[in-house]
Structures are given as structure tokens and as C-alpha cells.
């Protein structure tokens, strides 16, 4: 008796299963995993009745096994159905820890922004500052307040515009360090040393340049480093840090505003050295953006950076697939030539709907600043004083605390619900709150009841802003754009933010204050903010695409495929579904690694789902939930543990489908590391397939054509990669395992293409 028969007999005795040694539907006696031939370790057949049988083929590789379902009863035309599923044990789980820690740490740049913004609100109301810094030694005039507050934003506007030239030339990481340790610190030193209004303004302009660079590069760095399922929350942490900075500045200023000396303003300003030093020194230990390395064709460094950020070994197939996807998309875009600042405003084949994308980013940044939020944070203390509110400092502090608290649910909602719903809901609530404040302020005047109502709705407005527009705007404006122009577009959006900020800060005192050459609108200004909120909601509805859950590269495909923003959520789901609905006959990861596959009616998470099969982990699955045409099986992984599988597919067919062990597409990156490309090619490469099926939302298109389309996409990518990679990498820090010499980019891509051809050629 051979080993296989012994194995079968033992399994019959232990498992009370009917042994079977007829695997006629299995082609050959070996299974192929990553093209290494391995004999069967054991096999058995479980017969549930006379017409159905379920066969499991175990391989000597403990990480893989194949399950097949066979209907022994011929259909009407004599056909027999066999469904084959090749499963593997879970790959090592990705670690989100480093991506989260890196994203939150660089958000300290937002803390600097918020701290400096909130500081000026308190400093201009300090008794010592009014007496010794104000030119007339008693108070600041409307024009002086306007210049002192707004000129920080003037500096940030120019800082944001120069940011892409520095970050694309020297990297995201050095740019953040330089702007923090050098530019911002110089401006801060001038503010600390100032004994008059002029030097204080000059210092704020220079500090503003540093903050402007930070505001353009930090969200960009966060977007390029984060995993797609965490990107929204991580970028939103930038806004959360801004709110914390505002709160801390208010607390510090309350502690020093009554001091009768220069320390009243120098202490809160000087503390900015601490925050800037933390960011500058900490950046030394963080990796550069992997997409920047791809931009510079330093692929080995990009792989190392991804390894650090994803918590995966450098040879992990998921990490390498992500690297290939980034490289493919960038090379496709770069094949159209170098990009300039004007390309940010040009739609082309490699940058679909680019005009709409840049308009969207600029518009939402502008409406964020014109929402009324900075009026409260810049002039809140003075406004509360003028409307009869007692202890305006305390009310201002409470508003900052609300801002911090409600930024936290916003970090959750942006990835859970999506960008569009959050922006739309937030805009509506903000509009209502602003209009109520205006109506109450105009109709009731300076009464106690009116003050309480206004404070309550101001807090409601701040809560809505913090949870929605505060963070989501930075998320959208950082992720909308192709890699070739991403830094430039992000900088333009940040510059738009600061330009509107500057304009609002400059003109608001003239609109609100009472006196000559002013409009004396008072609470009526909230009618303006409320009206702008309504316009913002309309713009979001018709311009903002839903990008939740997509990689930065898949967002390009979204804009290429989705005809408009209104139905972009539908197309977003299509793209995400296509990424998961690859043929079930190919290698798949277990449910621990596929968390976004969706839910069935019974609320069990499927491993993979398509129109024909729902392969579900049924650990703990209630027996009464199994339908009559469902088939359940327990697969032994060889270590004593079982994986419970249920297949809801009917076991009849009109054509014979023999079980095959399909080859897993295997790509060698030229450094001895393998990559499974089983599900799809790089998304930005235009597929050879027709789009009619895609546009008709026929899910069978994905199921039946994914393998073919994936191969076409990857093959197209390989050809483009070879043609476009004429430059060489200067990186010699990484030596491939099979070659001690550093390889050029062309060698790297040649190996990639040749290995791909080797493993995807007809067998």
C-alpha cells in the first residue's frame, strides 16, 4: 500500500470519511505553488450523498492546499461540474503601527500651524502688548490688527508655492526638516526679540513661509506613506494637531496674559522652539516617502521605505506588488513627458480630468477658510467682548476644546463613511449654525439669552467643522493627483488655503469693527459665512469624487472611468470589488488579510466573493444558516487545525470543467524577490479589454476576465517600463541577494520583464 493509501486509510479511521483515491478530475498527481513541484501529502474525498463529493488535495508545502467540489451526477448534457480552489495559510499580517506612528508624528507640523494661529488671537488682547507694542501705546487700530494677523498667511502663501520645488528636488523628509529647523526658527527668533510692531510682523511673515512649506509637504508625506485604508484618518491627524495647537496656545496665553512684562508674550512665542525642535529632530529617524524614491527611480530605497512603513519583510509579495503598482503608474504618466506647474491645469490621457481635480482641491480649501472658522479663532476674543459675553478668554478656550474633541470622530468617519458624505453633511450643519448665529445676533442684540444661544451654536459650528471640513479637506487635496504633479497640486491647494486665509484675516476687522472706515456688521457677518457654506455644499456635490478605500494609483482610474462625481461612489465600489473578485481558482489570502471584501446577508466575512461562489470562513457558523444547496467542508492544514469552508455555488453545469492547478503569476524583481500578481495589473495602465462590460456593471466581467486583463495590464506595464527606464539608479546601498553589485534601473526592469514572460508564458 502506498503512502497516499495509508494516508487515506488513516483519515478514514480518524475522520469517519469515505476514503477515495479516484482523483480523475485532478490533472496529474502534483500541485504547483509558485512553480515549485511538490507531491501530494495526503488526500481524501467526503461523500455527502450519491451525487456529490468534495475532495481535498493536500500538498507537502504546509502553506498550501487545494479543495475541489465535484458533482458526480452528469447534467442534462452529460457534463460534470468541478470547482477548484487553491488556498494558502495567511500571510504575515501587515502592521499598521509604523504607518500610524509616522503619520501622527509628522502632524506636529500642524501643531505649529495651529499654535501660531491661536497665539496671535490672545497676544493682541494682552495688556502689556497693547501698552508697549501697539504704536499708540493703548490699543491696536483696525488696520494694525489686520496686518499683524494676516501677514502670517501672506508668508504661508509664498511658502506653499515654493514647497514642491524643494520637496521634489531634495525629498519630503529634508524639506520638512529644513522648513522647521531653519526658516520657522528664524522667524520665531525675530518675534521673540521684537519690541515693536514692525519686527513682530516681519517675524510672522518669515515664520509663515516655514509653516506654508510644512502645510504643503506634511499632508503630501502622510498621503504617500499611509496605507489606503488608513490614509484618511492619518491625514486628518494633521487637522487634529492644528486643533491641539490652538488649544495649547490658548491655555499658555491665559497663563501669561496678565503678566506685566515682555514675558507675557515672549514665553508663548518662545515655546514654539520646543515644538519645532521635536519635529525637526524626529524626522531624522523616519523614512523618506517611497513614492518620492520612485519619482527619483531609486527602487531599492523605495522597497526599504515600504518595508519600514508596512511592517513587512522586503521580500513579501504584497509589499512588492505595491511597489510595482506605484512604479507602473508613475512610468505610464512619465511616458508623456516631464510635468510643469502648468500641467496641473491641463487634462491629458495620463492625467484624466486634471482641470476638475485641481479645481476641486482649490475650491474646497478656499471654502474651508471662508467657512467662518478663522473669524472665530482670529477675532473670537474681541468678538465675544463686543457682543457682551463675560470672560471671553474662557469662551475662546472652550471653543478650542470643542475643536480638539470633535476632530477625533472626524478621523474615523473619513475612512468609514467616505469623503463626500462627510463634507456634505458637515457643510449643511455649518450653514445652519452660522445662519442661526446671525439671526439671533441681529434680532436679540446684547442680551444674556442671545449670548448663550450664540455661544451654543458657535460650538455646534466648530464641532461640525472639526469633524468634517477641518480634516477631510486636507485628505482630499492630498490624494487627488497623479504622482508626477502631486506635490505641485498639493502646494497649489495649500497656497489657495493661505490666500483665502490672508484675505479673510485682512478684511474681517474692517467688516466687523465699529468705527470710521468700517462696515460695523458685527454678528451680521455670519450671514456671509452661512451663505458661503451653502455654496460649498453645492460645489462638493458636483465636484468631489469619492476616493475612500482606493490607493493613490487607483484614484487615477476612478477619474478615468467615473463620468461625474455624483455617481463616483458607485465606481469606487466597482474598482474596489474588482481588486477582490479575482478568479477563485487562483491563490488567495485568508480572511484575516482581506478585511474589505464585504459582508453577506448572514454577516460572515467572505474570503472571496463573486457572482458564482461565496467562499466563506464559517468558523462559528450556525448550521441552520446553511442553505440546502450550500456545501460545507473542513480542510485540515496539516497542523491539527481546521479551516471551515462553505461554498454556496450550485454543483451543476452545462460544460465539463476539469480541475487544474493554475500557475500563480510570478514576477522576479531582479533582486531575487518574488511577487504574486494574481489579481490585477497596475490600475493606471489602460487595459486591452473593452469597457462596455465595465460600464454596464456586469460583475461577471470581473470574474471571467480578471486573469486575462491582469496579464494584459502587466504585460503592457512591462513594455512601458523597459522603454521608459533609460536612467540608472545611483543607489548602491542595497545589494540583491543573487548579485552583489548594484543594478541599474534598466537591468532591474529587464529582469522584471523577462521573469514575467517566463512565468506567464503558455505551459
Swiss-Prot record:
Glycosylation positions in this chain: 136, 385
SUPFAM superfamilies: MFS general substrate transporter
Extracellular side: 121-144, 197, 253-266, 379-393, 443-452, 513-524
Keywords, alphabetical: Cell membrane, Glycoprotein, Membrane, Sugar transport, Transmembrane, Transmembrane helix, Transport
Disulfide bond positions: none
Skewed-composition ranges (Low complexity): 725-737
Spans through the membrane: 100-120, 145-165, 176-196, 198-218, 232-252, 267-287, 358-378, 394-414, 422-442, 453-473, 492-512, 525-545
Disordered: annotated span: 1-28, 725-763
Cited Pfam families: Sugar_tr
GO MF annotations, alphabetized: carbohydrate:proton symporter activity; D-glucose binding
Membrane-topology annotation of the record: Multi-pass membrane protein
Gene3D superfamilies: MFS general substrate transporter like domains
GO cellular component, one term: plasma membrane
GO biological process: carbohydrate transport; glucose mediated signaling pathway
Residue ranges, Cytoplasmic side: 1-99, 166-175, 219-231, 288-357, 415-421, 474-491, 546-763
PTM annotation, UniProt: Phosphorylated in the C-terminal tail on Yck consensus sites in a yeast casein kinases YCK1 and YCK2 (Yck)-dependent manner. This phosphorylation is required for interaction with HXT corepressors MTH1 and STD1 and ultimately HXT expression.
Presence of keyword Glycoprotein: yes
Sequence ranges of Polar residues compositional bias: 738-763
Localization, UniProt: Cell membrane
UniProt subunit comment: Interacts with YCK1. Interacts with MTH1 and STD1.
Protein role: Low-affinity high glucose sensor that is part of the sensor/receptor-repressor (SSR) glucose-signaling pathway, which detects extracellular glucose and induces expression of glucose transporters that bring glucose into the cell. The transporter-like sensor generates an intracellular signal in the presence of high levels of glucose to promote high glucose-induced expression of HXT1.
The protein's name: High glucose sensor RGT2
Gene it is expressed from: RGT2
Amino acid at each position: 500500500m502506498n503512502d497516499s493509501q495509508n494516508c487515506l486509510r488513516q483519515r478514514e479511521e480518524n475522520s469517519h470519511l469515505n476514503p477515495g483515491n479516484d482523483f480523475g478530475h485532478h490533472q496529474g498527481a502534483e500541485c504547483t505553488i509558485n512553480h515549485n513541484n511538490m507531491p501530494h501529502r495526503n488526500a481524501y474525498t467526503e461523500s455527502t450523498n450519491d451525487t456529490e463529493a468534495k475532495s481535498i488535495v493536500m500538498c507537502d508545502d504546509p502553506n498550501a492546499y487545494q479543495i475541489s467540489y465535484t458533482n458526480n451526477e452528469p447534467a442534462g448534457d452529460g457534463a460534470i461540474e468541478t470547482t477548484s480552489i487553491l488556498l494558502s495559510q495567511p500571510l504575515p499580517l501587515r502592521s499598521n503601527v509604523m504607518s500610524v506612528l509616522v503619520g501622527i508624528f509628522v502632524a506636529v507640523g500642524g501643531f505649529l500651524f495651529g499654535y501660531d494661529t491661536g497665539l496671535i488671537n490672545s497676544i493682541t488682547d494682552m495688556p502689556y502688548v497693547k501698552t508697549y507694542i501697539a504704536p499708540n501705546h493703548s490699543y491696536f487700530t483696525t488696520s494694525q490688527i489686520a496686518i499683524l494677523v494676516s501677514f502670517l498667511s501672506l508668508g504661508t502663501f509664498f511658502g506653499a508655492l515654493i514647497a514642491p520645488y524643494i520637496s521634489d528636488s531634495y525629498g519630503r523628509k529634508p524639506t520638512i526638516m529644513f522648513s522647521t529647523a531653519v526658516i520657522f526658527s528664524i522667524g520665531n527668533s525675530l518675534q521673540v526679540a521684537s519690541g515693536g510692531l514692525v519686527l513682530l510682523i516681519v517675524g510672522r511673515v518669515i515664520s509663515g513661509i516655514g509653516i506654508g512649506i510644512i502645510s504643503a509637504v506634511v499632508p503630501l508625506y502622510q498621503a504617500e506613506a499611509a496605507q489606503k485604508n488608513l490614509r484618511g484618518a492619518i491625514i486628518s491627524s494633521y487637522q487634529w494637531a492644528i486643533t491641539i495647537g490652538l488649544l495649547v496656545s490658548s491655555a499658555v496665553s491665559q497663563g501669561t496674559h496678565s503678566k506685566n512684562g515682555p514675558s507675557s508674550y515672549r514665553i508663548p512665542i518662545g515655546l514654539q522652539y520646543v515644538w519645532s525642535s521635536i519635529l525637526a529632530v524626529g524626522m531624522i529617524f523616519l523614512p523618506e516617502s517611497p513614492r518620492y524614491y520612485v519619482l527619483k527611480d531609486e527602487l531599492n530605497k523605495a522597497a526599504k521605505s515600504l518595508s519600514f512603513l508596512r511592517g513587512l519583510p522586503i521580500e513579501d509579495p504584497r509589499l512588492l506588488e505595491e511597489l510595482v503598482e506605484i512604479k507602473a503608474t508613475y512610468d505610464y504618466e512619465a511616458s508623456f513627458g516631464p510635468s510643469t506647474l502648468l500641467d496641473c491645469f491641463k487634462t491629458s490621457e495620463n492625467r484624466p480630468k486634471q482641470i476638475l481635480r485641481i479645481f476641486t482641491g482649490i475650491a474646497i480649501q478656499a471654502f474651508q477658510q471662508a467657512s467662518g472658522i478663522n473669524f472665530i479663532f482670529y477675532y473670537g476674543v474681541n468678538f465675544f467682548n463686543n457682543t457682551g459675553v463675560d470672560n471671553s478668554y474662557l469662551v475662546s478656550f472652550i471653543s478650542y476644546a470643542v475643536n480638539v474633541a470633535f476632530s477625533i470622530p472626524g478621523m474615523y468617519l473619513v475612512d468609514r463613511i467616505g469623503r463626500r458624505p462627510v463634507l456634505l453633511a458637515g457643510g449643511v450643519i455649518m450653514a445652519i449654525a452660522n445662519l442661526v448665529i446671525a439671526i439671533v445676533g441681529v434680532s436679540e442684540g446684547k442680551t444674556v439669552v442671545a449670548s448663550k444661544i450664540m455661544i451654543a451654536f458657535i460650538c455646534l459650528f466648530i464641532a461640525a467643522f472639526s469633524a468634517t471640513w477641518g480634516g477631510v479637506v486636507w485628505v482630499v487635496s492630498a490624494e487627488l493627483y497623479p504622482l508626477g504633479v502631486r506635490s505641485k497640486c498639493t502646494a497649489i491647494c495649500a497656497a489657495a488655503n493661505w490666500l483665502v486665509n490672508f484675505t479673510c484675516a485682512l478684511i474681517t476687522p474692517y467688516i466687523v469693527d465699529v468705527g470710521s472706515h468700517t462696515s460695523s456688521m458685527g454678528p451680521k457677518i455670519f450671514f456671509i459665512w452661512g451663505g458661503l457654506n451653502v455654496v460649498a455644499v453645492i460645489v462638493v456635490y458636483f465636484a468631489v469624487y469619492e476616493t475612500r478605500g482606493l490607493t493613490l494609483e487607483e484614484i487615477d482610474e476612478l477619474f478615468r472611468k467615473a463620468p461625474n462625481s455624483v455617481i463616483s461612489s458607485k465606481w469606487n465600489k466597482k474598482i474596489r470589488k474588482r481588486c477582490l473578485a479575482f478568479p477563485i481558482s487562483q491563490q488567495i489570502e485568508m480572511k484575516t488579510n482581506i478585511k474589505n471584501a464585504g459582508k453577506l446577508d448572514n454577516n460572515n466575512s467572505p474570503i472571496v466573493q463573486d457572482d458564482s461562489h461565496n467562499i466563506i470562513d464559517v468558523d462559528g457558523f450556525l448550521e441552520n444558516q446553511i442553505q440546502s444547496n450550500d456545501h460545507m467542508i473542513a480542510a485540515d492544514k496539516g497542523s491539527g487545525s481546521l479551516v471551515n469552508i462553505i461554498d454556496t455555488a450550485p454543483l451543476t453545469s452545462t460544460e465539463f470543467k476539469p480541475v487544474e492547478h493554475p500557475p500563480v503569476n510570478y514576477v522576479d524583481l531582479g533582486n531575487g524577490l518574488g511577487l504574486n500578481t494574481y489579481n490585477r495589473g497596475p490600475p493606471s495602465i489602460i487595459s486591452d479589454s473593452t469597457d462596455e462590460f465595465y460600464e454596464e456593471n456586469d460583475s461577471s466581467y470581473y470574474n471571467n476576465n480578471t486573469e486575462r486583463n491582469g496579464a494584459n495590464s502587466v504585460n503592457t506595464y512591462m513594455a512601458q517600463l523597459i522603454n521608459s527606464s533609460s536612467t540608472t539608479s545611483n543607489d548602491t546601498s542595497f545589494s540583491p541577494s543573487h548579485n552583489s553589485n548594484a543594478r541599474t534601473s534598466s537591468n532591474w526592469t529587464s529582469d522584471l520583464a523577462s521573469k514575467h514572460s517566463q512565468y506567464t508564458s503558455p505551459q
